[in-house]
Amino acid sequence: MTEPATAGHDYIVPVGTPLHRVHRDRPGAIAWFDTSEHGRFNLTDVTDRGTCYLALDPLGAYIETLGRILTRSRDDINARRHSTVAVDRDLRLFDLTRSEARAAYRSAGLDHTATIRAGDDYEAPQRLARLFHDDDYDGILYTARHDPGHAHRSIALFGRAGPNDTDVVFDSCETDTIGNDLIDAGRATFGIAVLAYPISEHANDEGSSRWRSDAGVG
């Protein structure tokens, strides 16, 4: 993957850049800005502000959403969609993938450790999200948690909390089913198997260690 130019802590996503999101096939899911405690960079204590998770490429969105469980049923895949969106302005993101980001960790009283990107305790990354939001960043660029090769980049985009009209948040949006090319790439690169038959409730339990990837929970 080509690394776009980054100045200091800033990572600029130019207007019109295609971004990718894998999400449930339900109303409001494309431009959903989460406020719960269950999102790594959610703005849990900022009134009326939430976080929408995207990626710079389709496989990055696929692995970030589905990489926790390495065996999926076809029904599970069919219940999801792949959306390609673009924004009508440049996005200024804080780039957590750069070593220079350590200063930001220290200013928030945090250690520069992989737990920010991949740990199960979300308190620290949520504190960082609040810090960057208050510094007028549009969001955060980080390494996809479930990618052991650290090749794919994810985006935590800040915006109005809850479901939003897609055409208000994004300049363009195309949504389709998850194609076989993406499924094949997920299997070849990350070992995510998609089975034609249903998986038992226990096997598809996201809390079951048997079906979790080594990278953990995203």
Residue ranges, per PLM feature:
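Extended catalytic/binding region for NAD+/ADP-ribose chemistry, centered on the ART fold
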Residues: 41-73
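Active-site and NAD+-binding cores of ADP-ribose-processing enzymes
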Residues: 1-36, 71-218
